């Protein structure tokens, strides 16, 4: 995988050098002056001597190579969804919660007595003074 990345980088570095040696700079655009804005559309409407097929081929190769290069280096990047703990981060900021200190009863303090059950008189059950 590393060899293919190095090969693609070498192609990107060598491509401008090879193209500059084989083709001459376009001389027709030398007369296009950016200070004369009214002449720019007529100056750049001329037909190019380079075929459109070459332009599409070069753009397609560059898009393909940049896609392969991006896919090759993506696992080594530690950003975005590729981060180590990306799925553990909350999507919204967590509200600040102040922890309250719990009241701890002393160890040697006796517990409060349990509530006594209600008292029912025998006389109240029978309905009189028998």
UniProtKB/Swiss-Prot annotation:
Q: Where is the signal peptide?
A: 1-19
Oligomer and partners: Interacts with E3 RID-alpha and E3 CR1-alpha.
What is the name listed in the Swiss-Prot or TrEMBL entry for this protein?
Early 3 receptor internalization and degradation beta protein
Give the matching Pfam families.
Adeno_E3_14_5 (PF04834)
Q: Topology with regard to the membrane?
A: Single-pass type I membrane protein
What species was this sequence derived from?
Human adenovirus C serotype 2
NADP recorded as keyword: no
What this protein is reported to do is described as: Prevents infected cell apoptosis induced by the host immune system. Acts by down-regulating a number of cell surface receptors in the tumor necrosis factor (TNF) receptor superfamily, namely FAS, TNFRSF10A/TRAIL receptor 1, and TNFRSF10B/TRAIL receptor 2. Down-regulation of these death receptors protects adenovirus-infected cells from apoptosis induced by the death receptor ligands Fas ligand and TRAIL. RID complex also down-regulates certain tyrosine kinase cell surface receptors, especially the epidermal growth factor receptor (EGFR).
């Amino acid at each position: 995988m590393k060899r293919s990345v190095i090969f693609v980088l070498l192609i990107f570095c060598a491509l401008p050098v090879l193209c500059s040696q084989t083709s001459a700079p376009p001389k027709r655009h030398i007369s296009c002056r950016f200070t004369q804005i009214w002449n720019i559309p007529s100056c750049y409407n001329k037909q190019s001597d380079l075929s459109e097929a070459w332009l599409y081929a070069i753009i397609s190769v560059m898009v393909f190579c940049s896609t392969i290069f991006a896919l090759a280096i993506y696992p080594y990047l530690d950003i975005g969804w590729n981060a180590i703990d990306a799925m553990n981060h909350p999507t919204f900021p967590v509200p600040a919660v102040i922890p309250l200190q719990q009241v701890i009863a002393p160890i040697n303090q006796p517990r409060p007595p349990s509530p006594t059950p209600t008292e029912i008189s025998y006389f109240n059950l029978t309905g009189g003074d028998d």
